[in-house]
C-alpha cells in the first residue's frame, strides 16, 4: 500500500529518534543513543555586481550525536534529560571540510505529564522552531531566526493535545542571556559577568500549531531584547559593536495535505521589526560629536511550497520565497529565492538526496547605484543514521 505523506513527513523529522539504539531499559528508565553522519558534495557560486566567485566542496552537513534518558514515575509523570552534540567549524582555524570540532547544540532537562504538558529548562528548541512547513535538507531559503529565535537558553512550556485534540501543540518560551563578558584581559575588563553587547538579553515567545485531519496551521510571536552597546561599553563607538535593541516578529504557516495524492501544499510567511538605538561618535578630528539617530528595519516574506511522494521511499519537495527588507532611512532589499530537491531512502537508516537553490537579491539605497547579488548552490548528500 502506498505510504501516506503524513507518515513520510513524520519519518523524515524523527528518523534519528526512531533509529536510536536503546542501551538501557529497566524499571521505568530508558536510555537511548542515536545520531547521524551527513556528508555532502556541492558546487556553489555567488555573484555581486558581475564579480563571480565559485567553489566546490566535500564537507560535513549537520552530523550529530545525541543521548536521551527518560524516567517514568507513573500516573503519566516523567523526567527526561537530553544532550546533542554537532560537528562544526564555526571558529577560526577549523577545517574546510566542516569537521573542525564538537560543540553542544542542545542540553536540557524536562519534567512533564502526558495530560498536562511539560516544562523544559536548558539550551533547547523553542516553539518557533517547528512553525514553518517548508522542507529542505541543506540549502533552506527561509531564515526563521531573523524573525523569531528558534533555540537558545530557555525555560519553556509545551502542551500536546490529547482526548480529541490530537495534533494540537501549544507552547511558550522565556529566553535568557547566553553570552556574557568573560573574566581576564579583554575589551571590557570591568564588565565581567554582564551580558555581552549585542547579544540576547532576554526574550519571550508564544505559539500554536495544529497538524491533523489533513490540515496544517501554525503561528508564533516573539520579542527578543538585545544588550545595547551604550556609552558604558563603547563611548565613542570605536568598536563598531552594532546598534540592535529589540526584534519583534511573527511566523505563520497554512497547509493542506492531499492524502490520496501524496501531496502537501503550504504557505509560510513572516514579519519582523528590528529597532536600532541612537549612538554618538566623535568626528575624525575629534572636534565635534556626531549623532546617529535611531531607526527601524522591517522585513517580511511569503513562501509557497510543496512536498510530493513521487514513489515509495522517494520524495520531491520545493519552495519559493519573496522577501523584502526596508529601513526608514531609505535602504531597501528585495530577495527572490527558489529551492528544489529529491530524496530517496536506500534503507530505513540511509537517506540520499540532491538539492539545489538559487537566490537573487537587489539592494537600493539613497544616492547609490543599485546592487545585484546572485547565489547558486547544488549538492548531493548522504545521511547514515545510527
UniProtKB/Swiss-Prot annotation:
Q: In the UniProt entry for this protein, what further remark is given in the free-text comments? A: The sequence of strain D2/D3R is shown here.
Q: What is this protein called?
A: Outer membrane protein P2
Pfam families in the cross-refs? Porin_4
Q: What is its main location?
A: membrane
Q: Where is the signal peptide?
A: 1-20
Q: Which cysteines are joined by disulfide bonds?
A: none
Query: What's in the keyword line of the UniProt record?
Result: Cell outer membrane, Ion transport, Membrane, Porin, Signal, Transmembrane, Transmembrane beta strand, Transport
SUPFAM superfamilies cross-referenced by the UniProt entry: Porins
Q: Spell out the PANTHER family in the cross-references.
A: OUTER MEMBRANE PORIN F-RELATED, PROTEIN YDDL-RELATED
According to its UniProt entry, the function of this protein is described as: Forms pores that allow passive diffusion of small molecules across the outer membrane.
Look up the record and report any one GO term of the cellular component aspect.
cell outer membrane
**Cellular compartment(s):** Cell outer membrane
InterPro entries reported in the protein's UniProt record: Gram-neg_bact_OMP (IPR050298), Gram_neg_porin_domain (IPR033900), Porin_dom_sf (IPR023614)
What GO terms are given for molecular function? porin activity
As for family, the record states: Belongs to the Gram-negative porin family.
Species of provenance: Haemophilus influenzae
In the bilayer, the protein is annotated as: Multi-pass membrane protein
Question: What are the GO BP annotations of this UniProt entry?
Answer: monoatomic ion transport
Subunit structure comment from the entry: Homotrimer.
